[in-house]
Amino acid sequence: MKVVILAGGRGTRLGELTKDIPKPMVSLLGKPLLQYQIELLVRYGFSEVILIVNHLSQPIKDHFGDGADFGIKIRYYQEEKPLGTVGGIKDLEAELTEDFLVLYGDVMMEMDLKRLVNFHNGKESQATLVVHPNDHPYDSDLVEMDEEGLIVNVLPKPHSADLIYHNMVNAAVYILSPAIFPFLEKGKKADFGKDIFPRVFTDLKMFGYNTPEYLKDMGTPDRLEHVGHDVQSGKVKRRNLENRQKAIFLDRDGVINENVDLIHKPEDFHLYPFTARAISKINTSDYLAVVTTNQSVVARNLTTIKGLGEIHKKMETELGDAGAKLDAIYYCPHHPDKGYPEENVAYKIDCDCRKPKPGMINNASRDYNIDPLQSFMIGDSEADMGAGKAAGCTTVSVMTGFGLRKAKTKPDYLFANLEEAANFIVDEPYKNLAAKVKDLASTSSKETLVINIGGNTRSGKSTLATYLQKQLKADGIDCLRITLDHWILPKSERIGKEEVFHNFQIDKLESDVQSIINGKTIELKGYTPHPDYDVEDVTYKLEGQKVILIEGVVALATENLRTISDFKIFKSISEDLLKQRMFTYYDWKGYSEESIQVLWETRKPNEYDLIAQNEQFADLVID
């Protein structure tokens, strides 16, 4: 397959950088942008490139010559005058007698070109456009596709202010067949995105190839700097779909938007105020943002696939307006229960995609080479947690929406909302601490290393303990985690002032923990953080684990607990944040605002102020 690269861009917005060279020759970490494209083509076995040049073409010719030094044959077509993205290609009609690849020479790209070619051939496409969501769709050329990827509409910029759209943008990479040429006019300046594709998508078999791989224009100094950072950090190469990807799978209702029952029209769809910030945070990371949502409203005949698409258009438009994007959306329109009036029987089936089955996660993992073991599932229901666990993901519940109430499948992590969860996953705030703990464990001469994690309620102790446990396991270090909340008395047996040591049965707790360390088996009734959860029996037994993690409010509160610890961590929290989290947590548990205020005023002097003093005993304090 021949390749045509449009390499005549002036790059006027780059100012002095393109004073003496064309835009594709702008240096990026000591190498012209165009050279990155040439090297990519060589890597995927392309053997012949035609560079369409005009403005300041000599620097390109001097650098690349005939391509021999780069392992590829390069020829040049010199335009007499600039003819946009179309004119030069029309002039090459006699040479381009088979399908050919078109690149824009001012785009930094890193993608699996073999996948692209296979997609094009598999669809028997006459024109394949590489497309992707971006963070500024409102000023980009947009396309709409059906379930098979067939392009059913092309919407060139500019767009009307009230347009509701799917965030799917022309990424300026195409595979075209000779069938395109009758629609191109010789000698006339034209643009594929603005003038040609909107006119021919009904005449040609035209498909969109959606990829999360790296494709960015470098038209401004800020974008150039951003791309340079991504190249240097390795992000550009990591996004190639030859490499295993990481994803954050997102449930929709109750996580991204307010959980109105059975949303079946756009006017009932409302994003949470924090959602765009959270998804934008994911977009800055190596994680893909992928929605997996059960939408039985189709099976119930409350809406159609097209109607569901209109709801998703609203979601994508509002996110795009805020600079956020979803890399992909997977939905299950089915429901297994039949026999209801007005149902859509075509979708009343027992499918493989409806959560808690992992079908949607598995499909996304196949489509984008995602490793579920490096990925997260964020949801608000037991079905979400079940799907995530079945696929092998780390599971995260949020307190919004259903809030995982009345669930038997517990998550790995619990956060207030999507933003809090996304910040934790992306920022990985305990990464350095985990490295320190791993070093302690691997160098300790003790048979078992005991680490205590103390701090006030809602300070993040459990989150920290879970993270450390997972990081240790990933390095092959077995860990026994002792959660001190399991010694908390049932609510009916606690004393009125919420005296912390009484409520934790401190004498029994100290004795039991010492017994566990000595190798004895301890069985407890356990503790549940939510009144809708079943209380489950807990058994603790040390069975050769290298590390014991003791985690709880009172973990540093007594001399006996401190004495058995080899490394003591205190998780601190400001009073304002503690109060905020407490109100969120007890609201999730069903308390009224008034009762939470009373609880705060009672527990602050009898627990929070008391536990805060334990910071002085820590070997390490974590904010």
Range-by-range predicted roles:
Residues G403-K406, K589-D623:
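Small-molecule kinase domains that catalyze NTP-dependent phosphoryl transfer to phosphate-bearing small molecules
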Residues K2-I5, K31-G105, E110-R115, T220:
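Conserved N-terminal catalytic core of the sugar/cofactor nucleotidyltransferase
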Residues L101, E343-A346, D352-M385:
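Conserved Lys-Pro-Asp/Glu-containing loop-to-beta segment of HAD-superfamily phosphomonoesterases
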Residues M1-K19, N243, A247-D253:
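N-terminal nucleotide-binding beta1-loop-alpha1 segment
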Residues K313-E316, M385-G386, D534-Y585:
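ATP-dependent NMP and nucleoside kinases share a basic, alpha-helical "lid"
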Residues L480, L489-E536:
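Conserved nucleotide-sensing/catalytic segment adjacent to the nucleotide-binding pocket
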Residues F376-Y413:
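Acidic, Mg2+-coordinating phosphoryl-transfer loop and its flanking beta/alpha structural elements
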Residues F100-L101, M108, K114-N121, N134-P137, ...:
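Catalytic-core segments of class I nucleotidyltransferases/pyrophosphorylases
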